[in-house]
A protein has these predicted regions:
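Membrane-interface extramembranous regions at the lipid-water interface
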Residues: 1-29, 44-79, 115-144, 162-197, ...
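Hydrophobic, aromatic-rich membrane-embedded alpha-helical segments
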Residues: 28-47, 106, 144-165, 292-312
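Active-site-proximal cofactor/substrate-binding loop regions of enzyme domains
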Residues: 34, 41, 63, 69-75, ...
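Generic multipass alpha-helical transmembrane bundles of integral membrane proteins
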Residues: 134, 141-238
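Short hydrophobic helical membrane-anchoring segments positioned at the boundary
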Residues: 298, 328-357
């Protein structure tokens, strides 16, 4: 199914109102209490984090809500901890049982992923209407077991196909109220992204292969008399050792940022529902600068600028996202509310245990 949008649809931009100072206070309290309670408070910390970002994300004058119960998240984590304890004790006394646990985990992984996605979606709401996620084990197993096996058998060549199928699985099974989302991207869109990234890696490898033989002799002979070895503490030797990191790390980060940015744009620009379509216009250069400067700031501040970094990237991503709609959003929401009420469900039956990762 493909929806045709009018030539002049109404564009509703997303806005983000989060502030670093506000979020820092939430973040530091979460960290301290999680440590003091040996991780028990981390369930409440997760809810507080999500509620802050949701409540500061605005669309057409309204903000989003995160409705999860921290106790449900704590139950899920305690359950996971219990399973891990059983695994550890059993493997300690019966080492040959480890493959059985590994196979059981792989078999249960699709169910865990569906449950996590369902919990997160049904605890997210906009204008009192919950989002939804509906899938089954068989469909999830194809995406999260079958295709990864294909990726291994093809030595990674099928990874772009996995990237496509994962987003297709998530978007096509997601919905807002009773209205489902659709995804009209194709695998070729993702192959093109990774092909460009692979080409950049090849170019980087060629440049390094050409440059190193020319650079190393120059560095060695810079302050070296004939017949002498370069001192271990020589600035030239230190620079020669740091040069690959200083050059290659930013390039690898740039390539990774390109893949991430292009994938986000592709996923949003091909996600739609009846009469509505998303529009994402993230720029690789801007994203790269944000990630690089965030990395440096967090490193130099020993982690204290993590809240500032999170607010910064969230603001840029959301302020470059918009919803194009044929009709007034108020009318769409009102119609959706009537359909939800007519079903008698209100999509409020959520799992009481969060098994999210």
């Amino acid at each position: 199914m493909e929806t045709t949008i009018n030539s002049s649809p109404q564009t509703l931009p997303f806005k983000f109102h989060g502030k670093s100072g506000e979020y820092f206070r939430i973040w530091i309290v979460n960290v301290v209490l999680s440590i003091l309670t040996l991780g028990i408070y981390s369930a409440w910390a997760k809810v507080r984090n999500k509620r802050y970002f949701y409540s500061n994300t605005e669309l057409d004058g309204s903000t989003f809500e995160y409705l999860a119960n921290p106790v449900a998240i704590l139950k899920g984590r305690l359950l996971a901890l219990g399973v891990f304890a059983v695994y550890s004790v059993t493997v300690w006394f019966i080492p040959l049982s480890e493959p059985i646990f590994v196979l059981a985990f792989i078999a249960g992984l699709p169910w865990l992923i569906v449950r996590a996605m369902t919990f997160n979606a049904r605890n997210s709401a906009f204008r009192n209407i919950r989002f939804d996620f509906n899938s089954n084990y068989r469909e999830a197993a194809k995406v999260f077991i079958g295709i990864p096996l294909l990726v291994m058998l093809t030595l990674g060549l099928a990874y772009p196909y996995f990237a496509y199928r994962y987003r297709d699985f998530f978007i096509n099974n997601s919905g807002f109220g009773t209205t489902g989302f659709d995804f009209d991207a194709q695998a070729k869109h993702f192959y093109l992204i990774y092909l460009k990234a692979f080409g950049a890696l090849l170019l980087l490898g060629l440049l390094v292969a050409v440059a190193l033989p020319a650079v190393i002799p120059e560095v060695q002979s810079a302050n070296q008399l004939p017949g002498q070895e370069l001192p271990v503490q020589s600035p030239q030797l230190v620079m020669m050792m740091l040069l690959p990191f200083l050059v290659i790390f930013p390039v690898y980060m740039l390539i990774g940022t390109y893949i991430h940015t292009a994938t986000l744009n592709t996923a949003f620009n091909h996600a739609y529902t009846a009469g509505q379509r998303f529009s994402s216009n993230l720029k690789v250069g801007r994203m790269f600068w944000i990630y690089l400067s965030n990395f440096a700031a967090v490193l130099l501040s020993l982690g204290l600028l993590i809240p500032w970094a999170k607010i910064r990237i969230a603001r840029y991503r959301l302020e470059n996202l918009a919803l194009q709609t044929e009709d007034n959003l108020d009318g769409i929401i009102a119609g959706e509310q009537q359909r939800v009420n007519a079903t008698g469900e209100e999509l409020a039956e959520v799992f009481d245990v969060d098994l999210g990762f």
